[in-house]
Amino acid sequence: MIFQVDNNDVFASDSGQGIDKNKETIILLHGSGLSHIVWSLTEQYLSNQNYNVLAIDLPGHGNSEGNCLKSIEEISDWLEKVFKQLSISELTMIGHSQGCLESLEYSSRYSKRVKNLIFVGGSYRMPVNQDLIDLAVSGDDKAVQLMMKWSYENSKKFIGGNPVEKIINSSRDIREVLATDLIACNNYENGSEALKSINCPTLFIFGELDKMVNLEK
């Protein structure tokens, strides 16, 4: 699905189903530097469960036009424009990593639209290692390699291989936007206040071996 926001094309993968007003809608928000592609398997599964499912590419990511947005707050306001454009009045948001921060901030600003929240591998505060930011800013491939190591290194023990790496490598070169995304995560400080405004069912999903999230906090 392609539509326009702020005179730029926005892409949302919908499994070719479009939006059925008689179905509940689930929004999938990708993590730093990524795109709708990382949600491919999840999107297909949820679509088969009779939901509207939209895996949205943020500006400058995947197939969406425009410049990469520089703050979580800016992204949340952009998402509101998306949902208005698509006439979505109620939704469930599923965010991964940076997408958790976006879902959290969005729900604190536009709570009337949000029916459920699901946070996958994320928290209300996600400080980023400065060395990782520096590598991303310089365009060093090691930034991506470290993210893969810290997030998915042990996945082969459970799923017989790591399809996520192949999915990521099939996306637009994430080095173009990774630094901006990581800095946005690192600079986001409204999480604790935003949490107080949540008034809908909320699920947190964490990976015990995921080193990108501090489970102690």
Residue ranges and their predicted role:
Residues 73-91:
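Conserved acidic catalytic loop of the alpha/beta-hydrolase fold
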Residues 8-65:
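Conserved HGGG/HGGXW glycine-rich cap/lid loop of the alpha/beta-hydrolase fold
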Residues 101-145:
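Flexible "cap/lid" loop of the alpha/beta hydrolase fold
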Residues 57, 92, 115-118:
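Residue in the alpha/beta-hydrolase core beta-strand immediately N-terminal to the catalytic nucleophile
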